[in-house]
Amino acid sequence: MLLLLKQSELNDALKILKSQGVIAYPTESVFGLGCDPDCEAAIQKILLLKQRPAYKGLILIAASIEQLEKYADFSLLTAAQLTVIKKTWPGPITWIVPSQKNLSKLISGDFESVAVRVTAHPIVRQICLAFDKPIISTSANLSSLEAALSSQQVNKMFKSNTLLNLVIDAPVSGLSTPTQIFHASTGKRLR
């Protein structure tokens, strides 16, 4: 069964994303925290919410590879590397790829690369398609704690924290482990 947000729920999420807000949403394996990747104020809210240092960087999650081109420089990859990446998308595989030169350090951290994924989760795809760009994706948890697997766990973890504006009440896709991360240039699995 394809699970999608009602139009009113989608509109609420878009309104928050467009106004420097933070949403919590289901992904393939855990709940994620997301915001507009072009809004540094919103990214700062996520870092504060998670108590995560900026040097680590964040993931961008999208509905298509085209949505990621503003942030990731796929032209620096070989045709073979790009073919391997495209075979894994949409899906639960995140790739570390060269970043565009102007990418915010709040996204790339201390790296010249960016972590990107084209998701297969229908709700995240719906949000990214309607938003017409990717969103930040980082696990919904305080740094060093287990990631939330449900909207109830997100609400409990972040109770009255006003930095989190919306928790989407829908299930994760059911992967029992976090999504895998690979480095595009080496093919090495990092997680």
Curated annotation (Swiss-Prot):
Enzyme class: transferase
GO CC terms in record: cytoplasm
Reactions mediated catalytically: L-threonine + hydrogencarbonate + ATP = L-threonylcarbamoyladenylate + diphosphate + H2O
GO molecular function list: ATP binding; double-stranded RNA binding; L-threonylcarbamoyladenylate synthase; tRNA binding
Keyword Metal-binding on entry: no
Stretches assigned to the YrdC-like domain: 7-191
EC number(s) stated in the UniProt entry for this protein: 2.7.7.87
GO biological process, one term: tRNA threonylcarbamoyladenosine modification
Keywords for the protein's UniProt record, in alphabetical order: ATP-binding, Cytoplasm, Nucleotide-binding, Nucleotidyltransferase, Transferase, tRNA processing
PROSITE patterns: YRDC
InterPro entries: DHBP_synth_RibB-like_a/b_dom, Sua5-like_dom, TC-AMP_synthase, TC-AMP_synthase_SUA5
Pfam families: Sua5_yciO_yrdC (PF01300)
Location within or outside the cell: Cytoplasm
NCBIfam families from the UniProt entry: L-threonylcarbamoyladenylate synthase
Function: Required for the formation of a threonylcarbamoyl group on adenosine at position 37 (t(6)A37) in tRNAs that read codons beginning with adenine. Catalyzes the conversion of L-threonine, HCO(3)(-)/CO(2) and ATP to give threonylcarbamoyl-AMP (TC-AMP) as the acyladenylate intermediate, with the release of diphosphate.
Similarity-based family: Belongs to the SUA5 family. TsaC subfamily.
Protein name: Threonylcarbamoyl-AMP synthase
